[in-house]
Every structure is written in structure tokens, then in C-alpha cells.
């Protein structure tokens, strides 16, 4: 009888082990199916039950924004590229594609002129700022350039800011002292310092720390001028179109800067605005090229408009 009791006890323990093993197997086999531009893609969840979502290419008439459980969504994706999500069940995700034909062509001619609290607005940035300036001056001439100026150069970042742009900005602020009212300075740098080779590790936190340290010191140096400082987020990129930058690192860089700059700078979150409402990557300055980095003139005007609204609220 004792032997029988021993025999009936062991299978129960074994059954519990089998059930536990089955649960582990089930968690490993959770999948996310993505309807990508190149065809259906299936990604298995890791042992931790997570999946990192890929990027996807832009089309000839749309910008890829991210992923959603809803088919046909055109803006404000549920998930963004290179976002790591927890998978508790099998999922089916569809690309969120912003159709270029739906982008409004807004008139921003008088936005700066109507901004009474600032006598001058200075944008400091890289090629994205260059193209925004070219768009505004090309379409509105003196109505923009009389009050708005640009200190910018393509393919530049923090080193250029230290070596060249800082001196140019200081001179511009000294010249503006003769004018009534404060000067608004809007910085938009960082995307070129997030470049790295595909597949290599990149410490964006370290790069963000370098920016934060420098920008805080710069704010102290500029405290003697009648100016207010703003920092515009690094705006969206598409890794599938240009592999030298990753979406998740742009987001992480922005989060670090927004937190680290503190109250010395007013943060302008154009990144979230563009992801929510969409943007166009058909770049007229490069023959309509879509390089996953630069935008259309319509998008540059919308970015400028959002900046002006933030300046007005400050």
C-alpha cells in the first residue's frame, strides 16, 4: 500500500512540471505578424515575452509612421519603429502610412510679424533648419527675413556649435540689443550626432550628456543678453530609408535632453506633433528625394508654425 501511495504522488508532481514547461513554451511562441511593404513578416516573442518592432520603408506617396492594430490608419500610430512591446497574445499589426496628398499647405507669412513679445527670432541648426529657412524666405521673402534669421549649416552638430555657431550667435545677440524687445533663440541640433554604422552599438545617452553640459554652460554665457532660449526636439527619421540613424535612439536622445536641460530652455516637442499628425518626406530641395531624414516644404512650414505658437505661449 505504501508503494502505491508513492507511485500515485510522483505523477502529480511530474504533471505540474509539464504544465509549467508548457506555459514557458506558450510564452516563447507568441508572435507578432506585421504587414510590411515587402510582404508579411512574423516576429516571435523573446523569452521575456517582448518584440522589438522594425521600421518600414516609405512609399512613393506616403510616409511610414509606425504600426497599429487597425488597418488603414494614416496618422498617430499605436507603436513606433524600434519600440519594444510586451506580447501577451498573438498580434497582427498594420503599417500607419501618412498620405502626402493629405498634408495641408499652410500660410505662415505673418506669424513672426504678429509675435509682439520678440523683436527677433534666431534659429540655430543643421540642414533641416537650412531647408526650413530656404522654404520661408523663398516663399515669403522680407516678410519673414526682416524678423527671423538663421544660423545653420548642413551636416553639423555639437562640434560646429562650439567652434563656429556660438560666436555667430553671440554677435547676433549683441546686434539685437539695439532693438526693443527680447530675442528668441531656437536650437535644433542633434540628428547628425546620432549617426552610426548599421549594426554597431551607439551610446546616445553619452551624446545627450555632452549636449546637456554644453547647452547649460551656453545658457549661463548668454544670460547677460535679453533673450529667451528654446530647444526644438530632434524630429523623426526613418531607419528603413537611411540606416545611419535609429528611431529609438532619436526618441531616447530627446527624452534625455528634455529632462536634462531643465528650466534653462523651453522644450518644443515637434517630434510628437509630427508623429501624431503626420509629415511628408518628399524633399523638393533634393529633386523629390526621400532620404528618411529631410522633409517637404509643407512640413517645414508646419514645423515653423508650431514653433511660432510655442513662442507666443512663452
PLM region descriptions:
Residues 3, 16-101:
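Secondary-structure capping and domain/repeat boundary segments
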Residues 4-10, 15-25, 98-124, 129-130:
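N-terminal secretory targeting modules
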Residues 115-206, 210:
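Conserved SGNH/GDSL esterase-like catalytic core that processes O-acyl groups on lipids
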Residues 121, 185, 229-231, 267:
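Hydrophobic/aromatic residues located in beta-strands of well-ordered beta-sheets
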Residues 133, 137, 190, 216, ...:
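Sec-exported extracytoplasmic/periplasmic mature domains
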Residues 192, 220-251:
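Active-site segments of SGNH/GDSL-like serine hydrolases
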Residues 205-216, 247-253:
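Charged helix-capping and loop-helix junction motifs
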Residues 237-314:
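Catalytic His-Asp segment of secreted/periplasmic serine-dependent ester chemistry enzymes
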Amino acid at each position: 500500500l505504501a508503494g502505491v501511495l508513492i507511485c500515485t504522488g510522483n505523477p502529480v508532481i511530474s504533471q505540474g512540471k509539464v504544465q509549467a514547461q508548457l506555459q514557458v513554451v506558450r510564452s516563447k511562441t507568441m508572435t507578432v505578424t506585421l504587414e510590411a511593404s515587402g510582404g508579411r513578416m512574423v516576429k516571435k516573442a523573446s523569452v521575456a515575452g517582448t518584440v522589438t518592432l522594425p521600421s518600414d520603408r516609405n512609399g512613393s506617396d506616403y510616409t511610414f509612421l509606425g504600426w497599429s492594430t487597425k488597418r488603414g490608419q494614416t496618422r498617430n500610430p499605436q507603436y513606433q519603429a524600434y519600440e519594444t512591446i510586451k506580447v501577451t497574445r498573438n498580434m497582427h499589426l498594420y503599417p500607419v502610412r501618412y498620405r502626402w496628398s493629405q498634408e495641408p499647405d499652410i500660410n505662415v507669412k505673418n506669424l513672426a510679424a504678429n509675435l509682439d513679445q520678440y523683436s527677433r527670432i534666431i534659429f540655430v541648426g543643421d540642414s533641416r533648419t537650412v531647408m526650413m529657412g530656404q522654404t520661408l524666405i523663398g516663399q515669403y521673402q522680407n516678410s519673414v527675413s526682416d524678423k527671423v534669421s538663421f544660423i545653420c549649416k548642413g551636416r553639423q552638430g555639437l562640434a560646429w556649435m562650439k567652434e563656429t555657431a556660438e560666436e555667430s550667435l553671440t554677435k547676433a545677440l549683441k546686434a539685437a540689443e539695439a532693438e526693443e524687445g527680447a530675442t528668441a533663440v531656437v536650437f535644433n541640433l542633434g540628428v547628425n550626432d546620432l549617426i552610426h554604422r548599421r549594426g554597431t552599438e551607439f551610446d546616445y545617452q553619452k551624446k545627450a550628456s555632452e549636449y546637456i553640459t554644453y547647452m547649460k554652460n551656453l545658457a549661463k554665457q548668454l544670460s547677460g543678453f535679453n533673450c529667451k532660449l528654446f530647444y526644438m526636439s530632434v524630429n523623426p527619421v526613418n531607419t528603413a530609408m537611411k540606416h545611419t540613424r535609429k528611431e529609438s535612439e532619436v526618441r531616447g536622445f530627446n527624452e534625455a535632453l528634455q529632462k536634462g536641460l531643465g528650466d534653462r530652455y523651453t522644450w518644443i516637442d515637434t517630434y510628437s506633433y509630427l508623429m501624431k499628425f503626420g509629415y511628408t518626406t518628399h524633399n523638393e530641395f533634393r529633386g523629390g528625394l526621400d532620404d528618411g531624414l529631410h522633409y517637404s516644404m509643407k512640413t517645414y512650414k508646419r514645423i515653423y508654425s508650431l514653433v511660432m505658437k510655442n513662442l507666443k505661449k512663452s
